[in-house]
Amino acid sequence: MIPIIVLIGRTNVGKSTLFNVLTKTRDALVANYPGITRDRQYGYCKLQSNKKIILIDTAGLDIKLNEIEKQAQAQTLIAIKEAHLILFLVNARDGLMPQEYEISKNIRKYQKKTILVINKIDGINEASKINEFYSLGFEKIQKISASHNQGINTLINRYLIPWISEKFKKKITENLYKDTELKKIAIKVAFIGRPNVGKSTLINGILKEERMITSNTPGTTLDSISTPIKYNYENYTLIDTAGASKKKKKINDFQRFSIIKTLQTIEKSNVILLIIDASLQTCHQDLSLADFIIHSGKGIVVVVNKCDLFNSVELKKIKELIKSKLKFLYFSKIHFISALYKKGIFQLFKSIKESYEDSKRKISTSTLIRTMHIAIKKHQPPIIKGRRIKLKYAHLGSSNPPKIIIHGNQVKYLSLPYKRYLINFFYKTLKIKGTPIQIQFKDNENPYVKNKN
């Protein structure tokens, strides 16, 4: 299970700044689904030793005292329920505010481990302003300045990493099996998408039975359901994001799309089917989900459903538009299907298997070095301070997803366009399909530089 940490506090205490520092900003996924507060953001945070957490940034709680409980239930208390750890942020410059007593009361109701984070300590000389926060009664307290990156490492090393190590002792790795055993393992396929795009209908079509409840109401499915299946002698586990049992008649509290369950499903899967509604085409949520899947390093296959609603002329325009918007997923197959009429659904398995096998592929060092040299010959790295950046050799750092390590001189000066060029070249030359690849650049240190007097 991946740890979940939520940031809560009033407006302007620096939650979003800390969120961006920890997630490196670009990992954020904005939740814009029915029933979910738009101000809540979800992101991955990678700590030292490759410890990964899900971080939630919530809306500010700047409201009247008699409305706190009502408003918090609408946006922040749901996040608190989902979280394993709470980072309660306060603003040192403002001092202790009445709302923070109310927020702390709400936190204690759920008996979640909490760290009080006193932010914006830069330029503060009044010790009394900071000391008054101790009256909130939290044992774990850390002073930081998120905007100046001050105290962040202490927060991580003193509190977050020890907490993760203690609470999540069991480490789940996908590399426990030898290559010869991979065929015996079921490929875990997650069906991800916005509410009502046809995830359950697609699984029902594959299973040829009504295993999932389907309806036109967004948010019908509440808990993830895993279903084993064998197709063409290969074992698969189909995971529907958040499903509902027939016993559940009320969906009052959860007419919402569970981002947390989606992210957890992505984490435990091998290949992700990103399902898009052709009638709605692509929107910000689809693009955000796609970006999140790429950052998670999982294989991805794009499935555009409900194509039966359009004639051939309309469908051609939709295909062109969707391919244009998803051009950053050039390494992934895009399938246009009708889950309702079972058109094109079994062609998905070929792409799923390709994606899975390519994510596990072992690429030799000689192949990577040769590919790198061909790329350099066609397009040389830029010249920095009169010297051309040199890329010397490459090797595979890890698989699932494939991670290529390139060593050279001055590689820290490589531009983003040139890095993209190399990634695209490796994709094309190595014919990698359906899985993101990562490239890490390492500067070769000159052993004589450190010995200079």
UniProtKB/Swiss-Prot annotation:
Associates with the 50S ribosomal subunit. Residues 361-445 form the KH-like domain. This is GTPase Der. It comes from the Bacteria. PANTHER family: GTPASE DER (PTHR43834:SF6). GO terms for biological process: ribosome biogenesis. GTPase that plays an essential role in the late steps of ribosome biogenesis. Keywords: GTP-binding, Nucleotide-binding, Repeat, Ribosome biogenesis. The gene is der. It holds the Pfam family KH_dom-like. It comes from Buchnera aphidicola subsp. Acyrthosiphon pisum (strain Tuc7). Residues 3-167, 187-360 form the EngA-type G domain. GTP 1 binds at residues 9-16, 57-61, 119-122. GTP 2 binds at residues 193-200, 240-244, 305-308. Belongs to the TRAFAC class TrmE-Era-EngA-EngB-Septin-like GTPase superfamily. EngA (Der) GTPase family.
